[in-house]
């Protein structure tokens, strides 16, 4: 996936479950970020990975960013590698964005709780915030203190990418839109003549069984595992996304992505698209 996305100057965020030996040697540091959790074993692995790669971007990745331990870990990363770009999250409110940037030393905050397509956090816990509202609030906070945000979750089509930029996001993270392709992780499976790929959330029982030896008896799964129709090469999807955002810019008069928030207006609607001929495509 990295090799295909980097052709379009898109950044690949490697999973924090990657072992040191799994990282290729020929990575362009402009187009990938390594990820880490916040426990001591995560720190030891991060040190080993940085010795091998000297990465430009480090993503401190936890489902619940409202922890003092996250802020302290980000401080530790900043002290050890003063020149790296630190990404951390996830959060959905102004106060925590300011805490992570001002006191933690983060450069970019990842925004989104419960909005992912294979996330069930809002069902299991009742916790979350509508993604566009979170992006608008958090980007306003970050930009006021020379920081940036990534909108993480809730993207279903190229138009959603454009809306995330319109809400103030500096970056947009994609999961399900890039799943199910040749370059995506997992084997292609065939059933009744149709090809599929399995896609699962990182808080699902599938992920916890794979990486943590099962779901701990004090918690529940907060993700699901789904079977997606095989989509072929990711190149087609990437070109569709980029083409959609370019067209957004022409419709609203934005000369560049950075101008989208200044050129767009959001309106609340009951129906976004006309669906009268859905299912009749040829």
Description of each model-found segment:
Residues 1-148, 176-181:
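Active-site entrance/lid segments in N-terminal catalytic domains of soluble metabolic enzymes
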């Amino acid at each position: 996936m990295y090799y295909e996305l980097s052709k379009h100057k898109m950044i690949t965020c490697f999973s924090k479950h990657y072992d040191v030996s799994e990282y290729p040697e020929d990575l362009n540091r402009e187009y990938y970020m390594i990820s880490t959790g916040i426990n001591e074993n995560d720190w030891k692995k991060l040190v080993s990975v940085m010795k091998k790669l000297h990465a430009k971007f480090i993503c401190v990745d936890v489902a619940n960013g409202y922890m003092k331990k996250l802020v302290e870990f980000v401080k530790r990363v900043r002290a050890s590698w003063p020149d790296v770009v630190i990404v951390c999250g996830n959060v959905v409110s102004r106060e925590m964005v300011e805490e992570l940037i001002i006191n933690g030393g983060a450069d970019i905050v990842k925004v989104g709780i419960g909005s992912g397509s294979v996330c069930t956090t809002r069902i299991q816990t009742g916790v979350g915030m509508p993604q566009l509202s979170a992006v608008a609030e958090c980007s306003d906070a970050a930009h006021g203190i020379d920081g940036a945000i990534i909108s993480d979750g809730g993207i279903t089509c190229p138009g959603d990418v454009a809306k995330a930029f319109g809400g103030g996001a500096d970056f947009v993270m994609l999961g399900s839109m890039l799943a199910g392709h040749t370059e995506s992780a997992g084997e292609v499976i065939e059933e009744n003549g149709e090809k599929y790929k399995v896609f699962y959330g990182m808080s699902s029982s599938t992920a916890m069984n794979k990486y943590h030896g099962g779901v701990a008896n004090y918690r529940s799964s907060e993700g699901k595992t789904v079977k997606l129709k095989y989509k072929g090469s990711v190149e087609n999807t990437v070109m569709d996304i980029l083409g959609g955002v370019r067209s957004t810019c022409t419709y609203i008069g934005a000369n560049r992505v950075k101008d989208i928030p200044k050129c767009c207006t959001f309106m609340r609607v009951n129906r976004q698209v006309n669906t009268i001929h859905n299912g009749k495509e040829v």
